[in-house]
Amino acid sequence: MRILLTGAEGFTGRPFAAHAAAAGHEVVGLRADLTDAEALQREVGDVRPDAVVHLAGIAFVAHANDEAFYAVNVLGTTNLLGALVRLAAPPRMVLLASSANIYGNTEQSPIAESHPPAPVNHYGMSKLAMEYMARTYLDRLNVVITRPFNYTGPGQDVNFLIPKLAMHFAKRAPMISLGNLHVEREFNDVRTVCDAYLSLLLHGEPGETYNVCSGRPYELQYVVDLFARLTGHAMRVSVNPDFVRANEVHRLCGDPAKLDALLARSGIELDRPSLEETLGRMLSAAAQSERSSNSEPGTPKQFA
């Protein structure tokens, strides 16, 4: 199966491409800018994909340019779907990665796909708008939508929480500045997400939306303590008010029952590594990166 992958060089795109290739599929990374409809049309026509995994988009909630969320996450996706419907033979399946952020703040836990969306930031709003827009194509394309809950792994940008922690603990930094230590999130492994996406390309039901989650949330303070236990390093944590968002989602925990039941019908069970295993992999990668940087003379060390 030839898979057109957007965001192929991103945090999820790289391991997904490797996972799909290992399973015998051909993966072609999209080169065109999603906001350039003409270039996108040409490239999609050249690739003629059997399936599409759309991961490209702005994923950092605190991104400074609010308009960019909509330009890329909504209009860029519109351009992609518009190019796909013009193919003589449309792809068998199109997977669109949305986000659990569309649920917003809710007392419901775990959250099922049927829960009413109520996003509280531009990132979540742009993803929900993308979902609604995509549904206008369901009469012409087989589309599945995923709502991944928080996940992490080696290679994630240090703008995100867990990689930032891994870097600081690997460097045995004396302190770190964080936001609210009492928010609760799932911290799933990127490998699980990649496995789920490939499985949904093959077995997903068109028009359906699936949470990609574990149903196991952790308070941030617990994660900090686990890093300390894994490294034997006690680090002072400073709560920086600038990192505490006014519209913070306090608890985000998904219900995996719908996806698990779908895959079980095909004899598939997702492997969900423990948080300790995931953090261990990230510490190893961060330590390797630290050793590499130390081998370069004149590299400054900065901690924040």
Give the positions of each predicted feature.
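NAD(P)H-binding glycine-rich loop region in Rossmannoid oxidoreductase-like domains
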Residues: 34-72
